[in-house]
Amino acid sequence: MIKNIVFDMGGVLIDLDMQACVKSFKNLGFENVEEYISPYTQSGFMLDFERGLMSNADFCNEVRKLSGKTVSDKQIEDAWFQFLLDIPAEKLKLIKNLREKYMIYLLSNTNWIHFPVMLERYNLDKYFDKFYLSCEVHYTKPDPRIFEYMINDAGIKAEETLFIDDGPANIKTAESLGFQTHLAKANESMEFLNAII
């Protein structure tokens, strides 16, 4: 029996536009951005940033170094935000309804530029019992340690938990730990939850 639901953020709650982000970074002179960026798990210094091993200032300095141009922190942050579109209102409404019956968690590979803005813009703390963020716990999906951290901290059982993510590798790890899973498709509504639950 499902008692808990764990949502990924990017690609599940928030629609993504990686190509807009890539284009914006290239416009700043960061030509090889595609070596670092992915819809699921970043690479290199961007991975360090999502693991909380690099400050916002260090992230911006690294982008400046790789771009070879004098660009402001704001220009860099604006380019980085091109990755995120919005959270459809119907998804938040569904989560709010689900919270009446289930414990609701967010497990996300994210960073200290994106998450605080999304938290404030959408009042996410009204919809989730707790957030598990890669930049806070210093692990990124699909590393099993981020899942184990959540299990231990929340006091939940994997077999009683539905994990929803758009990353196949993340789903594979969750399944190996005993979670029930759903691989989300791009721009999928959450109506499937009515059938699963």
Residue locations for each model-derived region?
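Short amphipathic alpha-helical segments and helix-helix/interface helices
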Residues: 92-96, 171
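Conserved dinucleotide-binding and phosphotransfer motif residues
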Residues: 100-101, 177
